Amino acid sequence: MSLGKFVSFEGTEGVGKTTAINGLCERLQAQGIEYVRTREPGGSPFAEQLRELLLDTRTQINDDTELLLMFAARSDHLAQVIMPALSAGKWVICDRFIDSTVAYQGYGRGFGNADMLHKIEALIAGFVPRLPDITLWLDLPVAEGMQRAGKRSVADRFEQQQLDFFDRVYQGFEAQQQAQPQRIQRIDAQGEVEQVADRIWQSVSQQL
């Protein structure tokens, strides 16, 4: 049995990942493709507990602790959900993965500091056995995304950050896309829902 495909979605706050993933899953189902839909941080029972801690506005931890908790959640998620699904020939559709860690912890928290980025690279090398086959970076102006995200009822610990934090996060996604253009594909997230869905499908269908 051939391995399934691993697709991740990335972007700053309010870019429309949930809607985009809904659309892709509908198209995969129409093609008769089995898939597992998951998310980070989270995705497995233990990782979901860590997600609650990481997103709780009452949580006060330093940047290194936050980074290590992200990878603790990811390690369990990979072992319990992602790798078994791929081995069974299923596609995995993941809302955020390693590129969010680089963008949020490496650039948002770490200001693109080489020391923090090296720590992340070492953790990826040591604990991530499989990168996504394709990563869809939903590209939307930060201010527009924040305006969308602001309509949500309750902001989590990351959503409460200031605009300059998300400007750095955006720079992190942009830098990764430029460094890995084959894996990380930029998707214009502006326009109607179906327009964005078509752009995504154009990229993903190449994996069929």
UniProtKB/Swiss-Prot annotation:
PROSITE patterns: THYMIDYLATE_KINASE (PS01331). It is an enzyme of class 2 (transferase). Keywords: ATP-binding, Kinase, Nucleotide biosynthesis, Nucleotide-binding, Transferase. Its EC number is 2.7.4.9. ATP binds at residues 11-18. InterPro entries: P-loop_NTPase (IPR027417), Thymidylate_kin-like_dom (IPR039430), Thymidylate_kin_CS (IPR018095), Thymidylate_kinase (IPR018094). It catalyses: dTMP + ATP = dTDP + ADP. One of its GO terms (biological process) is dUDP biosynthetic process. GO terms for cellular component: cytosol. The keyword ATP-binding applies. One of its GO terms (molecular function) is ATP binding. Transmembrane segments: none annotated. It holds the Pfam family Thymidylate_kin. The keyword NAD does not apply. Phosphorylation of dTMP to form dTDP in both de novo and salvage pathways of dTTP synthesis. Belongs to the thymidylate kinase family. This is Thymidylate kinase. It comes from Psychrobacter sp. (strain PRwf-1). The lineage of its organism: Bacteria, Pseudomonadati, Pseudomonadota, Gammaproteobacteria, Moraxellales.
